[in-house]
């Protein structure tokens, strides 16, 4: 009978230690997840900006990087010089 009480006490102590260490580890992991979530939402809102405000061309065309403004419309994005 005394052995089962000791086993229960040891298990209870082990559970208590695990719960205390999990409480100190989890906040840093949740902080990292919230940082990633804010980066994702910032990227999503940046994708909703109007075309007139975007100066950078599509990355599908690696030759063109920025509009050169040679057509007197600096934000048209049709002609570029690298």
Curated annotation (Swiss-Prot):
Keywords: Antibiotic, Antimicrobial, Cleavage on pair of basic residues, Disulfide bond, Hormone, Secreted, Signal. It holds the Pfam family Hepcidin. It is found in: Secreted. Belongs to the hepcidin family. Liver-produced hormone that constitutes the main circulating regulator of iron absorption and distribution across tissues. Acts by promoting endocytosis and degradation of ferroportin/SLC40A1, leading to the retention of iron in iron-exporting cells and decreased flow of iron into plasma. Controls the major flows of iron into plasma: absorption of dietary iron in the intestine, recycling of iron by macrophages, which phagocytose old erythrocytes and other cells, and mobilization of stored iron from hepatocytes. Has strong antimicrobial activity against E.coli ML35P N.cinerea and weaker against S.epidermidis, S.aureus and group b streptococcus bacteria. Active against the fungus C.albicans. No activity against P.aeruginosa. Interacts with SLC40A1; this interaction promotes SLC40A1 rapid ubiquitination. This is Hepcidin. It comes from Sus scrofa.
């Amino acid at each position: 009978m005394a052995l089962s009480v000791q086993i229960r006490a040891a298990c209870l102590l082990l559970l208590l230690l695990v719960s205390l260490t999990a409480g100190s580890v989890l906040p840093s992991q949740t902080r990292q997840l919230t940082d990633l979530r804010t980066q994702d939402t910032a990227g999503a809102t940046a994708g909703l900006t109007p075309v007139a405000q975007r100066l950078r061309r599509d990355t599908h065309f690696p030759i063109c990087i920025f509009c050169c403004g040679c057509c007197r419309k600096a934000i048209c994005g049709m002609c570029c010089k690298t």
